């Protein structure tokens, strides 16, 4: 007899466990395949719950995606408040939340309308980290430029390293981001 995921992992019980399992499964699957390629049934199966529970707790797949993005963004903002304004702290936040950045990139590419109206506290946290004491358009411009560099690297870095035959490690990336961030 083969072991199934449900035989190995107990099914979640109660509202809090079910919601947490659905969000964790959505986070993993959305980061892996993007919003267009993931179904409610995929998420429910990975969470070990009936797909009707996804609808009960989140309404629609789109609302689940928005919830995952909003909650991960809030977690990043909380973590950012404990960091200094250095490049290492900024990059550590990226390393600690890779699924969020992949979901964000995939959502921007696949279904940008899903981001309309989603509160993203991580954006304000990055404005503070990158822009520092500066306020207004220039701090936000620097943040957008640094964000584009880093998110672009997350999405295309491996491919670009192969194409241009260069091996860029975390330290080299930190130096490159540091140059952009410090050019404020």
Question: Residue ranges of each PLM-predicted region?
Answer:
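Hydrophobic alpha-helical connector segments
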Residues: 74-108, 136-143
